[in-house]
């Protein structure tokens, strides 16, 4: 997976196309990511021991990884990622600007 937790990504497809946010969680088995402020759903929460009140809450739902691209602040757009070996370590690099992500 070319997207990691904490990355800033831009949504390239779907109802939230064009929105930016940071990755909160990555689900490699299902190829999905949870992005802050993107794909917000309304959930009806039952009262429980943890949440006495219950009610309607808004929360982010995971979106497929093919619908996001890592954001490059150098170009201000979503970019493809390639890997390079620097000092024996594999690092992610923007394919356009060549800067490390």
Curated annotation (Swiss-Prot):
Signal peptide: none
InterPro entries in alphabetical order: KOW, Rib_uL2_dom2, Ribosomal_uL24, Ribosomal_uL24_CS, Ribosomal_uL24_KOW, Translation_prot_SH3-like_sf
Function, as annotated: One of two assembly initiator proteins, it binds directly to the 5'-end of the 23S rRNA, where it nucleates assembly of the 50S subunit.
Gene3D superfamilies per UniProt: 2.30.30.30
Keywords annotated in UniProt: Ribonucleoprotein, Ribosomal protein, RNA-binding, rRNA-binding
One family name in Pfam for this protein: ribosomal_L24
Subunit structure comment from the entry: Part of the 50S ribosomal subunit.
Covalent S-S links between cysteines: none
One Gene Ontology molecular-function label: structural constituent of ribosome
Protein name: Large ribosomal subunit protein uL24
Family: Belongs to the universal ribosomal protein uL24 family.
GO terms, biological process: translation
UniProt GO cellular component terms: ribonucleoprotein complex; ribosome
SUPFAM superfamilies referenced in this protein's UniProt entry, alphabetically: Translation proteins SH3-like domain
């Amino acid at each position: 997976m070319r997207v990691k937790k904490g990355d800033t990504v831009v949504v390239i497809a779907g109802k939230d196309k064009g929105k930016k946010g940071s990755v909160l969680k990555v689900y490699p088995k299902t190829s999905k990511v949870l992005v802050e402020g993107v794909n917000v759903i309304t959930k009806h929460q039952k009262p429980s021991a943890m949440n006495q009140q219950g009610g309607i809450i808004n929360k982010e739902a995971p979106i497929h990884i093919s619908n996001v691209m890592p954001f490059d602040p150098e170009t201000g757009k979503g970019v493809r990622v390639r890997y390079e070996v620097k000092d024996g370590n594999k690092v992610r690099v923007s394919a356009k600007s060549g800067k490390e992500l």
